Regions:
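A short, aliphatic-rich alpha-helical micro-motif
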Residues: 113-114, 203, 255-261, 279-283
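ADP-ribose/adenylate-binding Rossmann-like module
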Residues: 73, 119-124, 135-151, 270, ...
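Adenosine-phosphate binding glycine-rich loop
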Residues: 11-24, 40-44, 48, 52, ...
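Glycine-rich phosphate/diphosphate-binding loop of Rossmann-like nucleotide-binding domains
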Residues: 49-67, 182, 186-260, 266-271
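Gly/Ser/Thr-rich loops at beta-strand to alpha-helix junctions
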Residues: 48-55, 75-79, 125-127, 215
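Glycine/serine-rich phosphate-binding loop and adjoining beta1-alpha1 elements at the start
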Residues: 2-40, 71-79, 84-206
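A short helix->loop->beta-strand "cap" motif at the edges of active sites that frequently abuts
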Residues: 66-67, 92, 137-141, 165-167, ...
Length: 414
């Protein structure tokens, strides 16, 4: 039994789903094979990913593989109500409503887990947290699962070290087919797409501060530079800071960057990146947003406590008027901007990421009997297969090593 906002929205969602399906060729090829082989026959899969059209396509592919699929979101603001209605119309149990409270969001996750899944797809680690706590009784059939994000993998590794990981988990985010493309090119494009659409402001000529120079931060900084911004990078890792410097970005601590930035984007996966001491020195009408998974990177609660007025400025933008008259603008309540006020990554990018998810779930199902409760890396053969399929779909080809070259690379003699 689904829980969605309004079934009359289904036609709009169906259009969105069909559109992205036409631009996800790697997943289409997997779907064709799954339809014949049914690798998930008799298995139930719970999927907690941003509930929009690309995720819907993944759900349909898994269903073609024989799975009983149950979909939910992974963020209170990223669910698209028309897509949730469309998936319900297509016969997939779906639990998602845009704009729910944190408690309502957790309740939707719990409803999803009542299917007692054999496999899970997690994005940020919320399902696995529930299965290791409040919903431990619903994990009795668990074979394993996949985690989509850097943040989620950090949580998984911490659980593994503490000996409380409920089941084997695949670190999908660490796959080459995922983080090289999704994190860099997907986040780079979708973050700026959301910022520009929401603010309707120029990027060129602005001083943009990017907090974090991991794969996501690299993409965000690269696209800002390409659109004519002066980019400052804030980092805690000396080598990432050096890398940013070599790419001709200015590097400085946030305490200094806060004084000169026009637009701030966090992408660290950590908490308290921009806090009250930074708000105190920011320019009037500075813009703040977050592209990390959780809403703890910009301390919006501290900003609200300092403000004498909190008011809407545009859809997706709140203004915070401070005692000295300055206004600071926060996008999407400090939640991940590219999905809370945007459409997420391009379909062609998620084609690769969700291909990794689909094949990793298949791998878990096949190897279920020999797995330990730990974090596994995606096998190289899955990564390579997806890379080659994507190249072929783009009409590209590459060279192949000869046997002599393979022997040379494997040997120690010249």
């Amino acid at each position: 039994m689904s829980i969605v906002k309004d079934m009359s929205l289904a036609p709009s969602g169906l259009q969105k789903i069909q559109w992205v399906r036409d631009f996800m060729p790697a997943l289409s090829g997997i779907e064709e094979r799954f339809r014949k082989e049914k690798p998930f026959a008799g298995l139930t899969i719970a999927v907690s990913v941003h509930l929009e059209a690309k995720t819907a396509n993944l759900g349909l592919v898994l269903r073609e593989g024989g799975a009983d699929v149950h979909l939910t979101g992974c963020n209170p603001l990223s669910t698209q109500d028309d897509v949730a209605a469309a998936m319900t119309h297509l016969g997939v149990d779906t639990y998602g409503v845009h704009g729910v409270t944190p408690q309502e969001y957790e309740d939707l996750l719990v409803e999803t887990l009542k299917c007692r899944p054999h496999l899970i797809v997690d994005d940020g680690g919320d399902l696995i947290s529930l299965l290791g706590g409040r919903c431990a009784d619903l994990g009795e059939r668990l074979i394993g699962g996949c985690e989509e994000t850097t943040t989620g993998i950090h949580r998984l590794i911490a659980r593994e070290k503490a000996g409380i990981l409920p089941c084997p988990m695949m670190a999908v985010n660490d796959a080459k087919a995922k983080h090289y493309y999704d994190n860099k090119y997907g986040t780079g494009q979708s973050t700026w797409d959301a910022i520009m659409h929401t603010t309707n402001l120029m990027v060129a000529g602005k001083t943009v501060v990017v907090a974090g120079y991991g794969w996501c931060g690299k993409g965000i900084a690269m696209r800002a530079k390409g659109m004519g911004a002066h980019v400052i990078v804030c980092e805690v890792d000396p080598f990432k800071a050096l890398e940013a410097t070599m790419e001709n970005f200015q590097v400085m601590p946030m305490d200094e960057a806060a004084k000169v930035g026009d637009l701030f984007v966090t992408a660290t996966g950590c908490k308290d990146v921009i806090v009250d001491r930074h708000f105190a020195v920011m320019k009037h009408n500075a813009i703040l947003c977050n592209s990390g998974h959780f809403d703890c990177e910009v301390d919006v609660a501290a900003l609200a406590a300092e403000a004498v007025e909190r008011f809407p400025r545009r859809e997706g933008i709140e203004g915070f008027r401070l005692k000295d008259g300055r206004i600071l603008n926060v996008l999407a309540q400090g939640r991940l901007v590219n999905l809370a006020v945007g459409n997420g990554h391009p379909a062609e990018i998620m084609d690769m990421s969700f291909a990794v998810q689909a094949l990793s779930l298949e791998w878990l199902a096949k190897h279920r009997d020999g797995l330990e409760k730990k974090v596994y890396q995606v096998p190289d053969e899955i990564d390579d297969q997806i890379g080659r399929v994507k190249l072929a779909a783009m009409g590209l080809s590459i060279d192949t090593l000869t046997q002599e070259q393979k022997d040379y690379l494997a040997g120690w003699e010249a």
